[in-house]
Amino acid sequence: GLLVLIDGHPQYMGLMGHPIADAYQSMLAERVEVLRGPASVLYGSNAMGGVINIVTRKQQEEGVKNNMQVGYGSYNTLQTEFSNRVKKGCFSSVVTGSYNRTDGHRPDMEFEQYGGYAKLGYDFSTFWKVWGDINVTHFNASNPGTVQTPLFDNDSRITRGMTSFALENHYEKTSGTLSFFYNWGRHKINDGYKTGEEPQKSHFNSKDRMLGISWYQSATLFTGNRVTTGFDYQHFGGESWNKVLATGERKSGVDKQMDEFAGYIDFRQDI
C-alpha cells in the first residue's frame, strides 16, 4: 500500500484502511514530499509502496496575501479555489476554500466537491511555536461502470474531516514536536445495479475515525550524530451498516476499534 500523510499524520479511512484521494486537495499543499519504495520500518505496513507527505501552507512573509483561481473546461468542468494568508508579528493564518465539479465524459459520471481549510499559528519565541488546523470536504461521485457492463445509480456521498494541533521547538542542537490529530468520515454509498437487475434495496453507510498523539525530541550530541526518542499512540476504527430503503431498518455490519502504541529510540552517526 501507499501511505499518505498530512504534516506527518496518517490519512486513511479508519475502518477499511485505504487512502481517499479526493480528500487530499491542492488547496492544502505548500509542497509535497515523496518517499519512493518500501518504508515500513519507519511508517508501518501501510507504507510498503512508499510515502507521500503533504506539507500544509503557511504564510512566511509579513503582510496579507489573497489569491483566487477559476478554471473552466470540457464536459462542464469547473475548478475554483480562493485563499487568504496573513502574517502579522508572531501570528499567522491560512484560510482556503474550493468548489469543483464536472459532468464527466460519459452519462452518469458526475462529480462535485466542496471544502474548506483553516490554519492558525503563533510563534512564542524564536524557539517555540504552536499551530492548529482543520479541514472539511464533501464530495458526490457517480460511477457509470464500464462501457461493456454499465452500472446504474452507483452513487457515493462522502464527507471527510481532519484536525490537528502541534507544539514545536527548534534549537541549535535539539528540536522536537508534540502533536495531536483527529480524522473522521461519513460515507453513504449506493452500490448500483447492472442491466437486467433490480435497484438496490439497501444502501451502505459507515462512520470511521482515527486519532493519535505523537511526541519526539531529536538532539545532536556531537558532529555527525543525531539521537531521536519518541512515542506514538493511534486509535482507529468505526462502524458500518446497510439502511433498508423501504423501512429505514438498520442492518449492522462491522463495528471495530483498535489501539496501538510504541516508543522508540533512533541513533544515527555519519561515518
Give the ranges of each region predicted by the language model.
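Short acidic/polar hinge/loop motifs at secondary-structure boundaries
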Residues: 9-36
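Outer-membrane beta-barrel architecture
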Residues: 63-67, 90-92, 129, 173-177, ...
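Outer-membrane beta-barrel transmembrane domain signature of Gram-negative proteins
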Residues: 200-271
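Outer-membrane beta-barrel channels and translocator barrels
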Residues: 88-91, 125-127, 137, 171-174, ...
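Hydrophobic, lipid-facing positions within transmembrane beta-strands of outer-membrane proteins
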Residues: 50, 64-68, 78-82, 114-118, ...
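Flexible loop and strand-edge segments within Gram-negative outer membrane beta-barrel domains
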Residues: 102-109, 113, 127-210, 248-251
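Transmembrane beta-barrel strands of outer-membrane/channel proteins
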Residues: 68-72, 95-99, 132-138, 178-184, ...
